[in-house]
Amino acid sequence: MKAREPRLGLTIGLVLLISLFGTASMAFSGLQGEYELMDGEPSLHESGKVILFEFADFYCPHCHMFEHVVVTKLQQEFGDKFESRMIGFPVMPGKLPTVFEMYNQAVTMGKGQKMKEILFQFIHNQDIHNFDKTIRTLVLKEVGLDRIEFEAGLASGKPFQTLGKNKKWGERIKVTQTPTVVLDGNIRIKNLNFDNLKVVIQSILDRDRKS
């Protein structure tokens, strides 16, 4: 009997493990559209809302277009059931990290969305790439932030630390290009057209209603 107990325990453990993975698979089996469930990444899902994490580079024209067209349409489609969060992830060579730090600081001051819009406009519509103090002052007027408080935040080094954490996250999940989109922290989307994202997001919301 004693010789069989380890085997019995192993068998029970395997059954439980299979059951656990089966349950996890069933949780996503109802989703529609093209997506990839990322192994080992925790879900950051909030019931009744889908969060789109976009690993993006402000200097990337594809990121600018994705934000301007696809994210805007998704926000109009789903309203408060959808949230977009940009994760600064530099990939364009020869660019300073200043804009990413500016964005991170604006997020802490409650103006991340507006800062994101203005930075994309300055870079892609006005062809401004050097964000020294003079240019930052113009940006801050557009965004509506106090210059002294903002500059103090930049000087603290915290926005740069946030950028480092974002880069580590992106490297961990093997982000190699921008934009890279992850829904709710663990659902990777490679087909970034509006129709596919709409289908996947809607199916997540439908799953919430049924649960």
Q: Locations of the language-model features?
A:
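Structural microenvironment flanking redox-active thiols in thiol-disulfide oxidoreductases
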Residues: 77-108, 113-140
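Extracytoplasmic/secreted envelope proteins and their assembly/folding machinery
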Residues: 68-75, 99-103, 116, 133, ...
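Sec/Tat-exported extracytoplasmic proteins
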Residues: 59, 70, 74-78, 106-110, ...
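N-terminal secretory signal peptides that target proteins for export/translocation
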Residues: 1-6
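Solvent-exposed, acidic/flexible segments
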Residues: 48-49, 63-67, 92-99, 108, ...
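Extracytoplasmic thiol/disulfide redox context detector
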Residues: 7-93, 167, 171-172, 206-211
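C-terminal cap of thioredoxin/glutaredoxin-like
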Residues: 28, 57, 141-211
